[in-house]
Swiss-Prot record:
A Pfam entry, by short name: IGPD
Its EC number(s): 4.2.1.19
Source species of the chain: Methylorubrum extorquens (strain CM4 / NCIMB 13688) (Methylobacterium extorquens)
SUPFAM superfamilies listed in its UniProt record: Ribosomal protein S5 domain 2-like (SSF54211)
Keyword Cytoplasm in annotation: yes
Stated name of the protein: Imidazoleglycerol-phosphate dehydratase
């Protein structure tokens, strides 16, 4: 089974994450940040990953540490669940519409973490959530999952729709990239023989 559990404790947060890459989209999310919970529930549902995330964070300061550390731990869990990456599709991309918004997400499960993030918001907050934290989450996730991740919003107006588009796009493209390709016949999808 391609599952993993991660616990991460710092002076700022206490995070526990579990993931099943071959799940059905079940989510149990409790970060203390309502909008982040919503985005992570979308991630689980659209990726068809079973995900449990619990964060106790220093929300009396702000939502930054909670959001970033959730991304770190989720990325670590994905990397652990993938193991040696034998048989995976490795690459995937998607154009993800959300009403007036269209975002493009591309992934390479390369073992070379990198983020290109070309998404911007016209407002600083979605409810109480700082929109700059969307990038912080994606950065933390990509670096710790060991993936190359390109995120670009081609156009969009509504900040909620933009955020939802990139989170759903991450989920849908990751779902395709981690899928087992029977033609790989259990091989690592690289001429180097490892990722």
């Amino acid at each position: 089974m391609r599952t993993a559990s991660i616990s991460r404790r710092t002076a700022e947060t206490d995070v526990s994450v579990s993931i099943d890459l071959d799940g059905t989209g079940k989510a149990t999310i409790a970060t203390g940040v309502g909008f982040l919970d919503h985005m992570l529930e979308l991630f689980a549902r659209h990726g068809l990953f079973d995900v449990t995330i619990k964060v106790e964070g220093d929300l009396h300061v702000d939502q930054h540490h909670t959001t970033e550390d959730a991304g770190i731990a989720l990325g670590q869990a994905v990397a652990q669940a993938l193991g040696d990456k034998r048989g995976i599709a490795r690459y995937a991309d998607i154009h993800l519409p959300m009403d007036e918004t269209l975002s493009r997400i591309a992934i390479d499960i390369s073992g070379r973490p990198f983020l290109v993030f070309r998404t911007s918001f016209r407002v600083e907050k979605i409810g109480q959530f700082d929109t700059e934290l969307v990038r912080e989450f994606f950065q933390a996730f990509a670096m710790n999952a060991g993936i190359t991740l390109h995120v670009e919003t081609l156009y969009g107006e509504n900040a909620h729709h933009i955020a939802e588009s990139v989170f759903k796009g991450l989920a849908r493209s990751l779902r395709k990239a981690v899928a087992i390709d029977p033609r790989e016949d259990g091989r690592v999808p690289s001429t180097k023989g490892s990722l």
